[in-house]
Amino acid sequence: MKPRIAVFKFASCDGCQLQFLNAEDELLKLAELVDFAYFPEARSRAVEGPYDITFVEGSITTPEDARRIIRVREESRYLVTTGACATAGGIQALRNWADIEQYRRVVYPNPEFISTLSTSTPISEHIKVDFEIWGCPIDKHELLSVVRSLLSKARPALPSHSVCMECKRRGNVCVVVARAEPCLGPVTRTGCGALCPTFNRGCYGCFGPADDQNMESFVRLLAAQGITGADAVRRLRGINGYVRPWRETADAIGKTIK
C-alpha cells in the first residue's frame, strides 16, 4: 500500500498548500508513489487517518483548532509544519501584542458569536512537531525534499544559514552596505534564493530566523542606520515576529520606548 499523505489547514492563507500544486510535474510523479488521502485544497476525496506524513499549514487561533490539532497529531506518524503561520504564528500573531476583545468589538457587528483565542500561536506550542519547513510561502523544492527524505526513511536536511550567504553565492551587492537599505538578511534563514536583495530590496524575514543569528549585533546594525525604537520593533514584528529570538528582541526594544 502506498504511504498516505494528509494536508491540513488551520489559520492561514492557503499559500503554502498551493506550493504542492505549484510543483506541477513533480507532483504528478509524487502522486505515483503516495496516496494523498486528505488534501481538500486539491481533491474532494477525504480518507480518515492514520497517515504516514501529515503537513500542517496555519496557526492556532481558536479553541476548536487547539482541540483539532491534537487529533491530527494522534493520526500522524510524521507531522511537518509548513510556513510562517504554522512555524511562528504568522502575521496574525500581531494580535498577541494587542487587545483581542477590542478587535472583536470594532471588526464584528456581533462579537458575541466569535469564538477565538487571544493569541495566534505556532503548532509546536500545542503538539510535538517532527519537522518544520519555514517560509511565506514555503519553497516547493524544500517541500519535495522533505517528502523524498521521509519516503526514503532519511532525516530531512534543509539549509538554515542566513540569506547573506545566498547573496554571496549569487554575487549580489549588499543592499545594506551599498544602498543603506534596512535588511533582515543577516538574521534570516535562506530558502527564498535571496529574492528581495536580488532586486535591490532589503530582506523582510519571510523564512524566519537563521541558526547562526546574532540579534545583539543586528540591533546595533539597525541603530547605525538610524532605525531604533518603534521602527526597529515594527521591522522585527513582521511575518515571523512571534518566533522567540525576534519576539524577545522586539520586546526588549519596546521596553526602552518612552
Model-inferred region functions:
Residues 1-55, 60, 65-66, 70-78, ...:
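Iron-sulfur (Fe-S) cluster-binding modules
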Residues 98:
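Short beta-strand elements at the ligand-binding edges of bilobed clamshell
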Residues 85-90:
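Short gly/pro/ser/thr-enriched loop/turn and capping motifs at secondary-structure boundaries
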Residues 93-94:
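Active-site-proximal loop->helix
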